[in-house]
UniProtKB/Swiss-Prot annotation:
Catalytic activity: an acyl phosphate + H2O = a carboxylate + phosphate + H(+)
Family, similarity comment: Belongs to the acylphosphatase family.
PROSITE patterns linked: ACYLPHOSPHATASE_1 (PS00150), ACYLPHOSPHATASE_2 (PS00151), ACYLPHOSPHATASE_3 (PS51160)
Protein EC: 3.6.1.7
Enzyme superclass (EC): hydrolase
Residue intervals of the Acylphosphatase-like domain: 3-89
Active site as annotated: R18, N36
Pfam family membership, one: Acylphosphatase
Alphabetical keyword list: Hydrolase
Superkingdom of the source species: Bacteria
Name of protein: Acylphosphatase
GO-annotated molecular function: acylphosphatase activity
Amino acid sequence: MKALKIRVEGIVQGVGFRYFTRRVAKSLGVKGYVMNMDDGSVFIHAEGDENALRRFLNEVAKGPPAAVVTNVSVEETTPEGYEDFTIKYY
């Protein structure tokens, strides 16, 4: 089990990005959460096996049709044992 902190930048708010991310995560068995950030980016904490996370990142980098992803930064982190993938609101 690996865990990643992912920040996605570009036109990623107001375009269905969080719902897209949750759908992709659930289809791949990835756990964690996604949330909008005050700076206009989207933050994702994702946990899963290496292959699932690789596929997840590939899809997130594309985003939904209305999104324009300009940058994706990824950092490994410690798994926290999430049992589902959710959208967090602040």
